[in-house]
């Protein structure tokens, strides 16, 4: 059993697909927690969550014996209420964040940091940390860090559509992490051109910039086409098996990240680990929600 630190935000998701009301439920960092706990790993969760979601969260994770909740704090208010919209005409999902929780304190993470085999950080909202606090964690880590860009590249506002924005200071946030996960739209924002997706050559150039600040690998998720794995040895595409059906793609990248990082801590080579992660993620699109994701991981373990 490995020991993982998991940092992010628990969200309450309200999801529509092609303008039809579809799914409501918990989301955010609980997707990664569901996978790692379902696979039998020891997980220390660091997250702020709205008090109104306490019952739902505690009920959801009650049967996860390897989840350590000492870093989970319930704060007054509704927490992260997120409206997500998917449609065929959209290149990426649209997000409206109605409310948010305060940034996390680095101290509880730093206290546990020496115990971890790996640290997985997700910017579920983009409001998780002040930069100085996050940099203290990166500086103190002696284990691999996987960072998922996610909502870091969305405009920092509440109650309105969050546009993708350029983030010129991304190196100051991400330097020194081991694995950087982003999709093409997120890479576009980090490159300073959120208005268009990058070409293969531009993705490779971005990866070169990442390597220059100590990042060992860049993993660019490309939807049903799988993942681009970029290292100093060049790019490799890991193809995704065709999904039997598509119910909800919300947690697909989260499943990929958790499953891949788990194997990396066991010494599995990066491309092989990413291949297994993509396979599990392709199964995850056929279900919806945290509880079903946990059951999927349990079945993969068995």
Role assignments for model-derived ranges:
Residues 3-4, 12-23, 38-123, 127, ...:
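Conserved N-terminal subdomain of the carbohydrate kinase-like
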Residues 19-24, 208, 239-250:
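Short pre-catalytic strand/loop immediately N-terminal to key active-site residues, enriched for Gly-Thr
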Residues 21-34:
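Short catalytic helix/loop segments, enriched in acidic residues and glycine
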Residues 36, 183, 253:
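Short, conserved phosphate/pyrophosphate- and ester-handling motifs at nucleotide-, phospho-/glycolipid
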Residues 42-44, 213-216, 220-222, 240-302:
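Conserved post-catalytic alpha-helical subdomain immediately downstream of the catalytic base
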Residues 55-70, 141, 196-214, 234-244:
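Short, electropositive alpha-helical surface patch
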Residues 145-148, 219:
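Structural detector of well-ordered beta-strand residues that form the stable sheet scaffold
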Residues 153-234:
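Conserved phosphate/ATP/ADP-binding segment of small-molecule kinases
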């Amino acid at each position: 059993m490995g020991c993982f630190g998991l940092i992010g935000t628990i969200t309450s998701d309200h999801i529509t697909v092609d303008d039809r009301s579809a799914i409501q439920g918990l989301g955010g960092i609980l997707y990664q927690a569901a996978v790692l706990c379902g696979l039998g790993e020891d997980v220390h969760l660091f997250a702020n969550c709205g008090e109104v979601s306490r019952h739902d969260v505690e009920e959801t994770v009650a049967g996860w014996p390897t989840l350590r909740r000492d870093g989970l704090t319930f704060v007054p208010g509704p927490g992260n209420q997120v409206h997500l919209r998917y449609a065929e005409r959209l290149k990426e999902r649209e997000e409206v964040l109605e409310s948010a929780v305060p940034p996390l304190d680095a101290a509880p993470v730093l206290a546990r940091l020496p115990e971890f085999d790996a640290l997985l950080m997700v910017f579920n909202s983009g409001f998780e940390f002040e930069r100085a606090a996050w940099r203290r964690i990166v500086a103190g880590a002696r284990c691999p860090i996987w960072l998922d860009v996610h909502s870091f590249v969305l405009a920092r506002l509440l109650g309105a559509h969050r546009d993708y924005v350029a983030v010129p200071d991304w190196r100051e946030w991400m330097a020194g992490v081991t694995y950087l996960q982003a999709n093409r739209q997120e890479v576009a924002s980090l490159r300073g051109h959120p208005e268009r997706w990058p070409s293969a050559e531009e993705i490779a150039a971005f990866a070169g910039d990442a390597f220059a600040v100590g990042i060992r690998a860049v993993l660019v998720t490309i939807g049903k086409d799988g993942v681009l794995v970029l290292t100093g040895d060049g790019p490799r595409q890991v193809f995704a098996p065709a999904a039997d059906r598509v119910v909800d793609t919300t947690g697909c990248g989260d499943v990929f990240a958790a499953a891949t990082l788990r194997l990396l801590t066991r010494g599995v080579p990066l491309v092989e680990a990413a291949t297994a992660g993509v396979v599990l993620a392709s199964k995850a699109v056929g279900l919806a929600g945290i509880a079903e994701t946990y059951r999927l991981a349990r079945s993969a373990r068995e």
